[in-house]
Amino acid sequence: MRINPTTSSSAVSTLEEKNLGRIAQIIGPVLDVVFPPGKMPNIYNALVVKGRDTVGQQINVICEVQQLLGNNRVRAVAMSATDGLTRGMEVIDTGAALSVPVGGATLGRIFNVLGEPVDNLGPVDTRTTSPIHRSAPAFIQLDTKLSIFETGIKVVDLLAPYRRGGKIGLFGGAGVGKTVLIMELINNIAKAHGGVSVFGGVGERTREGNDLYMEMKESGVINEKNIAESKVALVYGQMNEPPGARMRVGLTALTMAEYFRDVNEQDVLLFIDNIFRFVQAGSEVSALLGRMPSAVGYQPTLSTEMGSLQERITSTKEGSITSIQAVYVPADDLTDPAPATTFAHLDATTVLSRGLAAKGIYPAVDPLDSTSTMLQPRIVGEEHYETAQKVKQTLQRYKELQDIIAILGLDELSEEDRLTVARARKIERFLSQPFFVAEVFTGSPGKYVGLAETIRGFQLILSGELDSLPEQAFYLVGNIDEATAKAMNLEGEKK
């Protein structure tokens, strides 16, 4: 850890004597800078452009070196808007990579990509900073223990359980509920979880970032009265920001999480919403840097960029980072290079389905498409594994029969198939659940369902003990006892 040269005015003045360049070309968020011979900055060095625009407004733009072009020229990407910059402006090489504040003082605060607080609560009380570019932990430092991370969401815990210290992806197109699911996980896990959380808002809506902040203050995850007791640090680089900021804000959040893991030796939760925007920003910058586009117009360095971020999210002997990432799926196409590259890094995938969302089943998690490396008898136990497999078999059979039902109707099915369909429809509805963060929309209080309760509920449906209950009794309830109580209420209403 070291003091960030960009935060100290005296440090900048000494650097000014050292290494000055001038802007030679501006192409949107990308700048070409000429330096004196033999004084070329390194790749990833932070450059500072200071001066005044034509109206006399103060300019302070930080850029990151991406390419050394030869002829004493470097190409850099700006982390903020380049409005007002002109050719010939002075550029200072800070001599180091971009550094951001880390440690306990970051909790309860909102930062931008540069690690500057944007919540109007004054400066951050820390002199400890860390560079955003670091190598992943060495192989020998990694921790390989396997344990389940309970979320209280039935469909996740039963069919695609999350790994403690693992990487989890929430895949879905526009408007199927990725952000709501992430907010529910923050609510369920961050409250019950003893450690700290870091939330990286990468290229998503500013309104959602604001809603999340307000919600965290209401729930006490951020303590307004005593900010030091807060449990979460927020890092935002929203949709309206230049691609440089969106491309690096994930690394800023990750750097803060790494400090809690490596120095404070804590278990950390890292939420990233949305990892696709990280790829998208890289793609925007890539063309401006003069690289030839690859498949579907993405950057040729897609796998490398994704790998350098994802490999740092891991568990070591000191502590763990459990990462939950929302992944936007363009046009609902899971074979698109961005989601396809992300898949390779994950321990569990939660796939959200537009078909289920259209039916009103929330969370709209597809039970057959979602996967987890943790769903093995030696990890979760025989009972959990058997129940999950039977649930999947029943739902798969129902899926196969849907064409026959659509053409011929239910009456043409065999007795056994009709029973399977009835149970599958109950299972489908029982996989829905009222969320704490969606109470405002649904009017139903949120429910947290423990893993043992979840397994018991599905075993009762599969065994046929609840065949007599109407399927609507299983819709948007918590545990199975609530479903039986709801069935009795429905029966009473009929009378």
Swiss-Prot record:
EC number: 7.1.2.2
Localization of this protein: Plastid, Chloroplast thylakoid membrane
UniProt name for this protein: ATP synthase subunit beta, chloroplastic
Annotated catalysed reactions: ATP + H2O + 4 H(+)(in) = ADP + phosphate + 5 H(+)(out)
Disulphide linkage map: none
Function: Produces ATP from ADP in the presence of a proton gradient across the membrane. The catalytic sites are hosted primarily by the beta subunits.
One term under GO cellular component: chloroplast thylakoid membrane
GO molecular function, one term: proton-transporting ATP synthase activity, rotational mechanism
Biological process terms in GO annotation: proton motive force-driven mitochondrial ATP synthesis
Organism: Brimeura amethystina
Cited PANTHER family: ATP SYNTHASE (PTHR15184), ATP SYNTHASE SUBUNIT BETA, MITOCHONDRIAL (PTHR15184:SF71)
Bilayer-crossing regions: none
Principal place of residence: plastid
Subunit-level organization: F-type ATPases have 2 components, CF(1) - the catalytic core - and CF(0) - the membrane proton channel. CF(1) has five subunits: alpha(3), beta(3), gamma(1), delta(1), epsilon(1). CF(0) has four main subunits: a(1), b(1), b'(1) and c(9-12).
Gene it is expressed from: atpB
Family: Belongs to the ATPase alpha/beta chains family.
PROSITE patterns assigned: ATPASE_ALPHA_BETA (PS00152)
